[in-house]
Every structure is written in C-alpha cells, then in structure tokens.
C-alpha cells in the first residue's frame, strides 16, 4: 500500500482503536494522548479503545497466546456472546456494546526492530499486507483510516544502569524501522 502524509480529520462518532506494541500499551496506563484527543474534540462523542499489547507485532497474530482472539475481533465488536475455538481452547467473549473501529492508530516497528536489518524486508512485507487489508476494511462506519506512529528512540533516562552502546545499537535498528 502506498503511504502518504495527510492530516487526520476526526468526525463526530468516530471509533478510534490503538493497536501495536508497548508504546500503545503504555497509553492504557498514561492516558494523556487520549485525554488530549477528547479535549480537542469534545463535541465529537468519540469512542477510544486501546488494544495495544507489549508483545504484539504486525503480521504476527497479535495477542501472544493461542487462547486469545486476534485484534480483528476487537476492532469490529457486536453486542452479545461469541464462542469460538482459539488454538485448543473454546473461548466465549461477551461484548456489551458495538465497537466498529474506523480510525486506527498503529504503533508497529519497535518489537520488530530487534530483528535488525535482517528482519526489515519481513517487517515491510507484513506492514504492507496489514495496511492493504486494514485500509480495505469497512467495519460499518466507512473505510478505515490509519495513522502510523514510528517507534520511539531508546533514550538516556539518566539511570545508573544506562548502557550507551546498547542504546546506540537499538537506535540504529529503530531508525531502519521508522518511516
């Protein structure tokens, strides 16, 4: 999929989902960004769900366990019970409300960067496939809009255990995986 920088316009009633690894996950615990979104658009009645998990990678079935459904289920939920077999386990999910993500904030690349230059082609192919599939999706609120967030750099937080060489190596890999 071709990617170009554009301005994101949020519309009244948009359902926003955060997906990806640790950067998205941490925003469940530190909701500053979500708060700013609601503050900037108080009349929009936005619904935000954070589906990020530190172990997730693009192209790898998110949710690190065979006993948990993939993120696609959570992006397009309908009220009621869904019983499905995931891996070797029968699981019943109970959704209390509709949620049809039409804006997705995607935080991919950090976990994948640990594969270094050798993993870059796989990451690009997985991201391209995910984008094509996601951008072609209509969860009942029109075509999905995606915002890609680049992984953040390894910073010196002034810890006595800080390893400058490790940080420099990590940042070289992160730069490869950053748009």
Feature map (PLM): residue ranges:
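Catalytic nucleophile-elbow at a beta strand-turn-alpha helix junction centered on a G-D-S/GDSL motif
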Residues: 15-29, 54-58
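Mature N-terminal, pre-catalytic/accessory segment of carbohydrate-active enzymes
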Residues: 8-16
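Boundary at the C-terminal end of the N-terminal hydrophobic targeting segment
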Residues: 3-5
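Alpha-helical cap/lid subdomain in secreted, periplasmic
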Residues: 10, 31-49, 56-179
């Amino acid at each position: 999929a071709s990617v170009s920088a554009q301005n994101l316009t949020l519309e009244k009633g948009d359902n926003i989902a955060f997906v990806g690894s640790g950067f998205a996950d941490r925003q469940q615990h530190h909701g500053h960004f979500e708060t700013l979104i609601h503050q900037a658009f108080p009349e929009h009645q936005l619904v935000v769900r954070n589906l990020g998990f530190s172990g997730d990678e693009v192209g790898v079935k998110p949710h690190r366990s065979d006993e948990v459904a993939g993120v696609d289920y959570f992006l397009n939920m309908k009220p009621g019970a869904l019983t499905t077999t995931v891996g070797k386990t029968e699981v019943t999910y109970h959704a209390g409300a509709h949620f049809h993500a039409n804006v997705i904030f995607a935080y991919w690349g950090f976990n994948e960067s640990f594969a270094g230059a050798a993993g870059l082609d796989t990451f690009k192919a997985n991201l391209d496939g995910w984008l094509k599939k996601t951008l072609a999706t209509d969860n009942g609120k029109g075509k999905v809009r995606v915002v890609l967030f680049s992984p953040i750099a390894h910073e010196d937080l002034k810890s006595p255990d800080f390893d400058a060489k490790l940080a420099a190596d990590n940042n070289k890999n992160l730069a490869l995986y950053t748009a």
